[in-house]
């Protein structure tokens, strides 16, 4: 009877002690700042850690006068599986100790390390402490399933050893959290690290961290991959999952070269088949995207959308020398070459210079003698397909651009402008007029120097712009 009562009393006391230990543990973790991820969720999915007794590993030989209150960890055990969770701590004045001092401190019996001393102990242990003194390599580091890397540093994390590289990174002025648990176990991420970054009071204990060999970063892992990453080591995971690596990682496998798509005509190389498809109209001359206002054709739909701004009469970019306005700043920059007399594109056949590369390419087609685009009605051939498109308006009697002075119609806006400059440049009969002309079409004033004339545009075509 007495023995059973004593056994039950001992069981109750042990249960209370375990609850108090768990309460102290949660209090220590809850002292940190609010995290970007839920610690409770991480701890609920993480297996209960087993304890590995380490005799006098975390004992310090620090002088008694140099002691300051800080976060103290029980020196009797180190968790075998430690989650990558930031832990709150207080600063202490001690910065670092050498390997000899560390070995000496392990012999002496002194109060336990504070947080920074414990961290420096782990750093030195990774460097020159005898590997046989503590078999850490057989224990695995467990990571959380959800990690927000940017939010982690935004909270004021002291350091981050994950793929830090060789960049000079300085911690913020006030540091109150850091993932110190990640340095205690033999993490397979760093089999032969050069040095680690550890920040204490805005000072770098070591300059850099060796990059992760396979180039895996937080953004490269999906949530499913990250869960798998916890259960299996990165070595076994790298054999099953192909990560997105860049050229800056020298250890990338030769078999992970990106696919290339080569143009059979000019030999130009592209990294995607879509880019090759967009390139092919350069050789075929196809311009499937045609402006319904002026009939000009384009190879890409995005270029057509930019072209439609021309017909909206919005030209905020003005030339300081002649006052001519443009709808795009790039067009204004090209226009300034006219005043400077700069013609960088020179034809190698006739020596004619051009301000724009597009005009230079169109001019070169006149020397080739190849007119592969022919009209099915009159068999007239053209160098480019959009010229054939304009020509087809002559057979359909579609001339949307009409001169208000003489009533002559044109298929293209460019032809109307040229007609006005040659014949009606000095005529001001219709200057400043708006409304409906003699043909009953809507009038749009010319935006350039031919402001005394108007472009007569069909209402049906004008509606198709918007």
From Swiss-Prot:
GO biological process: cell differentiation; nervous system development; regulation of transcription by RNA polymerase II
SMART domains: ZnF_C2H2
Gene3D superfamilies: Classic Zinc Finger
One Pfam family per UniProt: zf-C2H2_6
GO MF, one example: DNA-binding transcription factor activity, RNA polymerase II-specific
Region (Disordered): 446-466
Compartmental location: Nucleus
Principal subcellular localization: nucleus
Biased composition (Polar residues): 453-466
Residue spans, zinc finger C2H2-type: 261-283, 289-311, 317-339, 345-367, 373-395, 401-424
Listed SUPFAM superfamilies: beta-beta-alpha zinc fingers
Entries under InterPro entries matching the protein: Zinc_finger (IPR050331), Znf_C2H2_sf (IPR036236), Znf_C2H2_type (IPR013087)
Sequence motif Engrailed homology 1 repressor, residues: 34-49
Keywords: Developmental protein, Differentiation, DNA-binding, Metal-binding, Neurogenesis, Nucleus, Repeat, Repressor, Transcription, Transcription regulation, Zinc, Zinc-finger
An annotated GO cellular component: nucleus
Assigned protein family: Belongs to the krueppel C2H2-type zinc-finger protein family.
Function statement: Transcription repressor. Involved in the development of the forebrain region.
Protein name listed in UniProt: Fez family zinc finger protein 1
Species in which this protein is naturally found: Xenopus laevis
Lineage of source species: Eukaryota, Metazoa, Chordata, Craniata, Vertebrata
